[in-house]
Amino acid sequence: MKSTKRNTFFGLAALGALGLGYSVYKSFITSDKPSSLINLGINQERKSYTRQKVAIIVSESILAIQLPIQEILKNTKDVVFVLAPTIAKDEFLRENEVDSGLSFKVIETGTAIGCFHVLKHIKATYNIFNLHDFLPSSTKTSSDNEQLTFDLEEYVNLHLNNFLQNVVELPSDSTSIQETVNQYIYN
């Protein structure tokens, strides 16, 4: 009876050692770091991406900061880009060299309100946009533009806050936009 318990113990220990050895072997094979760095225990500096659900409305100010769209889509699971109505999806995908397998994370809309409706349905943890890109410039004085300004601001303030977890409205200067977006994309 004792020899059976001992044999079972040694068998399980050998199986565990074999599993551990295989996992170490697999990590060496699949690692993109040079083996000399792994052996020394030195890690290359890599960006750590968010694990949160993030939705970003891509408007002119987001395009201006030139985010690495392909890299972000490839390395994150739950980041979605919603395109403003002024941005064509095909052109956006081509300019940012987005793989066709990742294009489902880029959503095209036809209207400004449509962008915000998409945010409601995505139900992301962080919803990032620059409302100033959707509002007419202050130099225009048309009553239609004033009505659009009022309606969009009212819509965002009254309706979106009821549906979205965290609304992150971007500042107007490009440096602050870059810092704010990076804060939510990278850990």
From Swiss-Prot:
A Pfam match: Peroxin-22
One GO BP annotation of this record: peroxisome organization
Organism superkingdom: Eukaryota
Major site of localization recorded for this protein: membrane
Segments crossing the lipid bilayer: 7-29
Keywords: Membrane, Peroxisome, Peroxisome biogenesis, Transmembrane, Transmembrane helix
Compartment(s) where it occurs, according to its Swiss-Prot or TrEMBL record: Peroxisome membrane
InterPro entries (alphabetical): Peroxin-22, Peroxin-22_C_sf
Coiled coil regions in record: none
GO CC terms of this entry: peroxisomal membrane
Endpoints of the signal sequence: none
Membrane topology term: Single-pass membrane protein
Similarity comment: family membership: Belongs to the peroxin-22 family.
Function: Involved in peroxisome biogenesis.
Quaternary assembly: Interacts with PEX4.
Protein name as annotated: Peroxisome assembly protein 22
